[in-house]
Amino acid sequence: MNVSLYYSGTPVSSHSLLSKNGLSNIVLTCKDLPIPIDLLSLFFDILNERHPSFDEHMFLQMIRKPDDPENLSVFLKSAIWMLSHKRDLPGHYRLPLTCLVSTYSEYFVELKPRQPSTKCWFCKIAKDGLPFRVEGVHGFPSEAELYIVPSKEHAIESFEVLSGKKLYRSPSKKKHGYLIASNKPPLTSKYVEYDPSKPDTKP
């Protein structure tokens, strides 16, 4: 895999993948096969739509040299989804995208799984244990008003911001479970409505 980053000259595209990284072009070659910048831009858009926290800087790091197995897994799953589910994917993108999947899969040989975290994800992010607003949770309608709400080790209380919303259990395995409050039902069955009468049910 050969990657060349260009910082000067007129940008070949107005896409945020270039502008937010201060680049004018990204030239990527996979086993002598050039990867078009338009394909990289489309790939990033789909990856970011599926995983909003995966930003332009993370994507560039992934292209240059993957350094985290979990991020690499997300990266590859989105590429594979494009190949298997995106019906309008231009035919000339299939070979270079397949090459990316094949080549980047080999990085798993070098990368080791993350050490288990002993920190509570919710405690670290939430202020004073209060619900906080989030955008674009995969599995919920894009127009839904969403909040992350404490559960399990955290007391379930009545919060004013949750009026008119239902609570759903998250499938996350993170230490200290949490709930998602939404004014619209989820689009996937992996999120189920929270039943407070079953407190021992793990999210």
From Swiss-Prot:
Residues in the signal sequence: none
Similarity annotation: Belongs to the tenuiviruses p3 protein family.
Organism (species): Rice hoja blanca virus (strain cr) (RHBV)
Keyword Transferase: no
Protein name: Suppressor of RNA silencing p3
Record localization: Host cytoplasm
The protein's assembly and partners: Homodimer.
One of the record's GO cellular component terms: host cell cytoplasm
Gene3D superfamilies: Tenuivirus movement protein
Disulfide bonds: none
Role noted for this protein: Acts as a suppressor of RNA-mediated gene silencing, also known as post-transcriptional gene silencing (PTGS), presumably through the binding of dsRNA.
Major localization class: host cell
GO biological processes: symbiont-mediated suppression of host innate immune response
Key words, A-Z: Host cytoplasm, Host-virus interaction, Inhibition of host innate immune response by virus, RNA-binding, Suppressor of RNA silencing, Viral immunoevasion
GO MF terms held by the record: RNA binding
